[in-house]
């Protein structure tokens, strides 16, 4: 309110985003140096803004904001670096289709898949991502719209036909998965099944300018988390949300350097 005023809308941020400093090749080099086996990009989160061109919405980074296909550019750079590319998609929640305000955590799920129109939209966009980018990992979030539950097998069949070696996570309404996910959680795991630990560098997945370095996971704790995860047949998916300058926090680079030294 103090900085932008009461009439400023979420969508008003989009023209301010130019992505002038974004270099997908540099990102891919950092991922490769860190020893990443795969990368997962958030193509659309709960706000509904897409980082790829879509036949189903103008609310995307090619027609608005930076006027760039973030998904396509990073996919090409990551694959050129010899790393598998995965895509995240918020399948059940899209606030462009919801009108109810969110005051607490429970309200978040009250906005999930509010209409049949959104269920169709979500299905079509998921297929669009598979057709255009053939991701090695399809990371669906929250769940699958119940209004189009019968379309889930068709989507999964389409994905595996397009990407025979591809894998999907466990957020397809518990009906099918190639690996389980744990998000900011610890505790016992089933070592007989493949799983993935997912968390951010700090307390949030996106970059938070008000989140100080004291809130970030320390280098020793990060290495301990990685070793413990891999030793229990899991993978670590570490979210490293960039700053508004498209650059990573210094701490993220320090963790990468420390891990390389620990390997040598």
Regions found by a protein language model. Give the residues of each.
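Mature catalytic domains of secreted/periplasmic carbohydrate-active enzymes
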Residues: 1-264
